[in-house]
Amino acid sequence: MDEEEIKYFVRVRNTDLDGTKAVHIALTGIKGIGPHTSRTITALAAVDPHAILGKLDDESVGRIANAVDTYTEQVPDWMVNRQKDVYTGEVRHLLGTDLTMMNDDDVNRMRKMRSYRGIRHETGQKVRGQRTKSTGRTGTTVGVKRKKD
């Protein structure tokens, strides 16, 4: 490839990635892949993480896509985002809309079983034990009103 020839959008796992960024940064554009996971994927694909994604040849992009697809089989169980799935019991790494739908299903399951966390989700309150007396208030502020003379 010439120096000027660059693909501005690279399609990986049904997501358009920014071709002007480094590989390890561009991969974080896929929901479910963070900085640590993207570094691991570039190592599995044998691609320089600091290379510009749009300048890579199709074979390298294919290796990256293959590493993303086979990520679960190549890393330990503690490195995936869905360990011991509630329904199937398997270890999976969810990406994109699958991750969003599974999170919504988990919240709905907690609501249906009326667990403490489910009730907090239902009422729109904080779920993870944060303080609620002074922070997280919604609505308009009243402020200080003067007394009528």
From Swiss-Prot:
Keyword Cell wall biogenesis/degradation among UniProt keywords: no
Domain of life: Archaea
Record bears the keyword Ion transport: no
Compositional bias segments (type: Low complexity): 132-143
GO molecular function terms noted in the UniProt entry: rRNA binding; structural constituent of ribosome
GO CC annotations on file: cytosol; small ribosomal subunit
Its job: Located at the top of the head of the 30S subunit, it contacts several helices of the 16S rRNA. In the 70S ribosome it contacts the 23S rRNA (bridge B1a) and protein L5 of the 50S subunit (bridge B1b), connecting the 2 subunits; these bridges are implicated in subunit movement.
Name of protein: Small ribosomal subunit protein uS13
